[in-house]
Amino acid sequence: MIYMFLANGFEEVEALAPLDLLRRAGCEVTTVGVGGGDMIVGAHGIAVGADIPDTMFRDSKPEMIILPGGMP
């Protein structure tokens, strides 16, 4: 499983372009919202619904973790 962690202020292109490409390639990617709330808002105002909140992240051996950049 691949996990992409998203927090408010994430850089949208750094998150959404890889997310789209990985899912088109058939990879199982789960977005994890950091900091609570159902919607995570990027640096340029684009709101994204995370698949799970960070409190539900329990995978001790993920295949990959993606941490997009951004400004809080």
Enumerate the predicted regions with their spans.
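Extended, subdomain-level signal for the structured scaffold at the beginning of enzyme domains
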Residues: 1-72
